[in-house]
Amino acid sequence: MSDYKSTLNLPETEFPMRGNLAQREPEMLKSWTEKKLYQKIRESRTGAKPFILHDGPPYANGSIHIGHSVNKILKDIIIKSKTLSGFDAPYIPGWDCHGLPIELKVEQKVGKPGQKVSAAEFRQKCREYAAAQVDGQREDFIRLGVLGDWQNPYLTMNFDTEANIVRSLAKVIDNGHLHKGVKPVHWCTDCGSALAEAEVEYEDKTSPAIDVAFVAVDQAAVLAKFGLEQSDAEVATVIWTTTPWTLPANRGLSMAGDIDYDLVEFTKDGSKRAIIVAQELVESCIERYGAELHSVLGTVKGQALELLRFKHPFYDFDVPVIIGDHVTVDSGTGVVHTAPGHGQDDFVIGQKYGLEVANPVGDNGVYKPDTEFFAGQHVFKANDNVVALLEEKGALLNHVAYRHSYPHCWRHKTPIIFRATPQWFISMDQKGLRTQSLSEIEKTQWIPDWGQSRIEKMVENRPDWCISRQRTWGVPITLFVHRDTEELHPDSVALMERVAHRIEQEGIQAWWDLDAAELLGEEADQYRKVTDTLDVWYDSGSTFSSVVAARPEYNGHPVDLYLEGSDQHRGWFMSSLMISTAMNGKAPYKQVLTHGFTVDGQGRKMSKSIGNVIAPLQVTNKLGADILRLWVAATDYSGEMTVSDEILKRSADAYRRIRNTARFLLANLNGFDPVNDTVAIEDMVALDRWVVRRAAALQAEILEAYEQYNFHLVTQKLMQFCSVELGSFYLDIIKDRQYTAKRDSLARRSCQSALFLIAEAMVRWIAPILSFTADEVWQSLPGEREEFVFTQTWFEGLVSVTLDSDLSDDYWANLITVRDEVNKAIEQARREQRVGGSLEAEVTIYADEALTESLALLGDELRFVLLTSNTQIAPLANAGDDAVETELAGLKLLVDKTEAAKCDRCWHHREDVGQVEAHPLLCTRCVTNIEGDGEVRQFA
């Protein structure tokens, strides 16, 4: 016999080397849908302990971006890993469907409501637009391999959800948290509506910074406070502001009670002035005003000046000095211009002193007709006119352009204003909501843990929540208010339930179609319907009640986990906490996990103008969703998540390592029947027992990492195992035994059994992350099995057997180190062209006594571990000058080219080649494997 190829156990599998993910994944998705994969997962977990991850709804507008992909993939990894852990983990995706962005898109198509179309028609167009956006985003999310109830998602515009949002508000009202008030709120003049804190972004803006003098009404009274009887100069106090347009609404001058204020006399352009400013800011003020000389006439605490009155710089009334904790001496003058209608601090201190809440500005940002000097002017355009009038009146001491951070509308990207308007608020303090929320924050696990202090500070400092909006497309605030007293109808909660019942049937339009008499009867004339809509953050913030409590899949279980981007501490996490605590006295979640934003390779935000946007569909169409999923899993999401073409290329390289490992396992399971061929772990060859033990230990680490949501550790450990323990060591060593041993021998079946156990475990390890590839591997594994890996639990066949005391974990770890040193020495000999490959090498190991004793345990099988044809061990003292030093103490190596003949079948060079006459080209080991009982392997 001259061709021995047929006697070898060559690897064979239909599992392809190339993933071709971009082409293969859509076919798999189609199969998953046709075979009702998600429903089968649900059925497989009937009666299991629930794990509820509640989906924070993305906004139903536009294509998904890379941040959406990160979020959905992280959620999918968790859902799948929890399912593998035996939990019943449903995933119901949701969408946020009301609000301004959709209104603006619809306005562009059909015009504003009440002009070309009725409000009812406009709402219907908004509903249709949102539905189309949901359809588009749904397909994109499905393409990422995210499993969920995609055909039955929750939409905040679903009639039943809209009704439940109304019911949620009724509970908040019933618990005493709602109040109506005229308060300054963030107001976008382009939207014509109030904005929530979460709808405000801060951008740099150039504003006029001005110092304005308010002249004393009773100069003698002011001087007396400083112990003076008279002064040649006119006495004034000075404010510094970057919002000149708010001066028409000025009603007070705030000072700090415990700060020293100086009365400073100075000369400028030949005339004297006397001004009151904070002592710490005198030098900077005098420099700013370009004064020639100055002197301090006296000093008092701010408290001493309380209720002294000063003339408004251009109106015919005067305003008082008031004392406030918000005043600092960081900049300006230490005296704060106070307009209660245009600022939160101003409003609070104004309430304390009973100041008028003046609001001369209309919804559109234009001064009202009765505003002297500025009627009909837009506030930002009026700034220059205010400055000019101040100069004309002699009240302007300084005017410069000032660059600073300023609030902008998140949608229009335009500067916003604070403006006092009648609005509905959820009070933070009238029923202890702030205190209770802070208590609930402490009971919640925040991942990363800095999330706790972040949201605590926000809750501690946040104002009452303005929940009303003056918009068309939103859930209505379904209240009846008395026309004379402005009081809520005494049966408001019961009435809201009746309205909710109608909305359940007809949607939110039912409120606007409702004739008050239908519910109020003869009282109808005494009440008016509220026409405001709810802040969309209320919509999404109440979904723990409107969706989770209502969907049968959740069976009334509380939510375990909320997972969103780090901006949601002030958004969805906050609104959900406020509403849940107001309704039920507790947080809606047990754990809150946040991930960072995606940035490019240079740490910059994704921007179309920069041209660094990476669209998820471009990645899936080019590389495949599994590559994107691997990048997400491998990135530490606790900080910024860097992504670029180069980084994705590295993810593709890592993927190939995992895929090639899986393919090697599958190819070498050719002909293996798990039922009949499996070797018990205790009967395996020592090396196989060790690798099974390593896999069992790794599985424990991987499961712990999944449990802690440390997916980057999962990928690190998996890559380490594939590259080092398997790729560079175990799989390399077993090739000889796998290919050349007798087909049904214990030596080969032991190896295959270990490979099978590893493959069964690994396919589950990768399933939450590389979902498409895991399904592909699953279909290629030998033995009867259920249809999908996603209905399985973690593999229990990996038993952490106790190794022989002589062949411990430390023994094998040390052996890997020795092998690495041998490989280096052989590679050096190959570069020097002394050997062609490792099987041409004879290696002499010069070792100290301890290492000699250790290596000798393997006997002749040491050569299989080192991949050499012959290996001999000699005392370290015998090493000659030609022996190579290694990095391992007590080890030197000598590599020589073997003189022995090469076996045609196993390619080992052995002295016994040709000893069997019938097989002159084979070594005796190969003859035994062909014609005899097969070689016996004990160790490797």
Swiss-Prot record:
This is Isoleucine--tRNA ligase. Keywords: Aminoacyl-tRNA synthetase, ATP-binding, Cytoplasm, Ligase, Metal-binding, Nucleotide-binding, Protein biosynthesis, Zinc. Its EC number is 6.1.1.5. IleRS has two distinct active sites: one for aminoacylation and one for editing. The misactivated valine is translocated from the active site to the editing site, which sterically excludes the correctly activated isoleucine. The single editing site contains two valyl binding pockets, one specific for each substrate (Val-AMP or Val-tRNA(Ile)). Its cofactor is Zn(2+). The keyword Membrane does not apply. It is an enzyme of class 6 (ligase). Catalyzes the attachment of isoleucine to tRNA(Ile). As IleRS can inadvertently accommodate and process structurally similar amino acids such as valine, to avoid such errors it has two additional distinct tRNA(Ile)-dependent editing activities. One activity is designated as 'pretransfer' editing and involves the hydrolysis of activated Val-AMP. The other activity is designated 'posttransfer' editing and involves deacylation of mischarged Val-tRNA(Ile). A motif ('KMSKS' region) lies at residues 605-609. It comes from Shewanella loihica (strain ATCC BAA-1088 / PV-4). GO terms for molecular function: aminoacyl-tRNA deacylase activity; ATP binding; isoleucine-tRNA ligase activity; tRNA binding; zinc ion binding. Monomer. GO terms for biological process: isoleucyl-tRNA aminoacylation. ATP binds at K608. Binds 1 zinc ion per subunit. GO terms for cellular component: cytosol. Zn(2+) binds at C903, C906, C923, C926. A motif ('HIGH' region) lies at residues 58-68. L-isoleucyl-5'-AMP binds at E564. It is found in: Cytoplasm. Belongs to the class-I aminoacyl-tRNA synthetase family. IleS type 1 subfamily. It catalyses: tRNA(Ile) + L-isoleucine + ATP = L-isoleucyl-tRNA(Ile) + AMP + diphosphate.
